[in-house]
Each structure stands twice: as C-alpha cells, then as structure tokens.
Amino acid sequence: MDEIKIPKATARRLPLYYRYLIFLNDEGKEKVSSTELAEAVQVDSASIRRDFSYFGALGKRGYGYDVKNLLNFFKKILNQDTLTNVALVGVGNMGHALLNYNFKRTNNIRISAAFDINPEITGTIMSGVPVYDMSEMKKQLREQQITIAILCVPQTAAQKTANEMFDAGIKGIMNFTPLRLSAPSSVRVQNVDLATELQTLIYFLDSDKDKNKK
C-alpha cells in the first residue's frame, strides 16, 4: 500500500477505532455506523467520516461500515501483525508501573529491555523484563535493534540520557519527563506530562462549574 499522509490528530484516533472494532467483532457484530462509532469512542461522527476519507471508500452510504473489513484494514494500517520491542529507560515509580503494565492489552508492543542505575535492580528480571545497568544501554539497544524507547529518568538526566539513546539509533521516544527534549529531526518525541493533563482537566471542570452557576 502506498504511504498515506494523514494529520496527527487522525493518527492518534486510529487506535481508538481499532480497539472498538475488536470489541464489535468479538461481539459478533457485522456492521457499524459512524454515529454508533462516534458515541463509543467519543469523537464526533463528522470527524470519523473525515478520518476514514483519507483511506478511500471504507463504507457505503446508508449501510455503514463492515466491521470485519474495517478491522482488517486498520490492523494492516497499524501494523498489528508485527511485534515492536520497546526499551524502558528509568525504572523508578513510573517505570515500574509501566513494566507491570507492559502493554498487556495489545499483541504487537512489548517492553523487552529496561535500564536503570540502581544496583539493587540491575541484573535482575522484573515483570519478565531484564533490567540492565545504564552503562550497557547503547550496546543493548544496538544489539537488540530497538528503535523506540520510553524515557522515565529524572529531569536533570533526561537530555544526557536522550543523547545517548540517539547515538544508539533510537528513532522514537515517549518522554515521561517534564523536560522538552532537544532531538534530531530524524527522531520523533511524544511528550506525556501527567501533571499538565490533570491541570487541563481541572481547568475544564472549573469552567463547567462557572457555566452552571450562570
């Protein structure tokens, strides 16, 4: 299939659609409308139709979408048949939680190596994942051909650690540190700031309260 250019917002929604289509398929449902899909994933139906339009004719007017066909299509688009090994860099509280989780709800992503400086956990297996000393990171990333990593180190060590990851061939980082990393143009960084997300949620809740008072 030719490469399809889609907006970032659309790309973020594709896994939502895919997960719900898995549910519908497991329930034995054969077709779904954009309205039903919108209610389930909390995305308006116009956005769903626009998202799907980037991939051509996926449904029929008046019929909706064939669940099995749509599921197979997004399975291919999201590369669900290929296992992606991910490195976890930093096994503190957040890193430990991610190790325990280890994407058990997905079949195509797993944390296969973790790195830390704590001698009490390096050289051990945690939640089925080997934990290496940070001094081995570049060597292990290269040998295991890992190109995606989750960064959970303290903010003060984030950029230095990221630079070493770039040198080892990392092409994508999910950054759980508060620092906005300086990265080469060839590397994609996805920032995950839980404090900011919570503050945004609180802001909207407070705004809703103010509206209700009027």
From Swiss-Prot:
Binding site for NAD(+): G90, V91, G92, N93, M94, G95
Native organism taxonomy: Bacteria, Bacillati, Bacillota, Bacilli, Lactobacillales
Coiled coil, from the record: none
Alphabetical GO biological process terms: negative regulation of DNA-templated transcription; response to redox state
Assembly and binders: Homodimer.
Major location (coarse): cytoplasm
UniProtKB keywords: Cytoplasm, DNA-binding, NAD, Repressor, Transcription, Transcription regulation
Main function: Modulates transcription in response to changes in cellular NADH/NAD(+) redox state.
SUPFAM superfamilies found in the cross-reference section: NAD(P)-binding Rossmann-fold domains (SSF51735), Winged helix' DNA-binding domain (SSF46785)
UniProt family annotation: Belongs to the transcriptional regulatory Rex family.
Matching Pfam families: CoA_binding, Put_DNA-bind_N
Protein name, per record: Redox-sensing transcriptional repressor Rex
Subcellular location: Cytoplasm
InterPro entries referenced in this protein's UniProt entry, alphabetically: CoA-bd, NAD(P)-bd_dom_sf, Rex_DNA-bd_C_dom, Tscrpt_rep_Rex, WH-like_DNA-bd_sf, WH_DNA-bd_sf
Organism from which the protein derives: Lactobacillus gasseri (strain ATCC 33323 / DSM 20243 / BCRC 14619 / CIP 102991 / JCM 1131 / KCTC 3163 / NCIMB 11718 / NCTC 13722 / AM63)
